[in-house]
Amino acid sequence: MDRKIVVLDINTANFFNTTKDLEVWKNFFNFIQANNHQLVFMSSCWQQAVLYLLDLLSLDDVDIIAESGAIIWISKTNEFIYQSFLDSVSIDTIVHHAIITNSGVFAIGKSKISEEPNTTINYFISLEKYKQFKLIWLTEFDQTLKYQNFLKNLSEMDVSSIYVFSPQYHLDFQLMEHISSGQPKFHYSNFYNENFLFTSTKNSKFSALETYVKSKNCSLKDVHYLNVTEVPINNINQLASVVFLSKKQPDNDEEFNNPEISIVLKGICEQLMK
């Protein structure tokens, strides 16, 4: 049995809404690792948010493709592999429009002045939005109270992604693209309610997956892809298998219940045995 790569494309905030029976998932993950296959969690969320979920599931040796492909994290070595960074014009445009719409900003990247491989900075004008954002993502960080301190910290890092928390949906994306010289070098996704992710146009989940697969001396035909209520990757026809698992089935309003999840996961396990 050849070694396979199993990719779980997941939004951490949605995961526990998909199934109430975590044992089904734990058994699936244990099967993958017991048979020496590589488990990868992919997400629009940042690495620490995914790592928190892995801790809850008591999972080790799981690599992460985070920020919609902006970064790859290798668990065994704690290595952060950045695909690209946002340019200064894009950063200024995104941050400016977030601030004037009273939105929260959470930026991630690599420090220019220290050996810190991955760092985060934030600016939330509203204490309420700061608390809401932390509650959604079950994350902890100190609120930056002075805007000048935030800008200073921002200038001292290469920014891989910017998350904007905008409950009022006041962001003017057309204006933002226009300000970026009519050729925006960033793309964005409304990856969760009231949450937006901005990354470089050089990034994509698929390109990050290609980079990761090559580093493992594997091919895309060794990849089994399971999407759980996330923005899907491109070129899925190049993968060994693809399964979409959501809380709602596409054809009706019935919930995708636990027995059906069990059947889906069992089917993937059978493919891995071939």
UniProtKB/Swiss-Prot annotation:
Keywords: ATP-binding, Nucleotide-binding. It holds the Pfam family Hydrolase_3. ATP binds at residues 104-111. InterPro entries: HAD-like_sf. One of its GO terms (molecular function) is ATP binding. NCBIfam families: MPN552. This is Uncharacterized protein MG374.
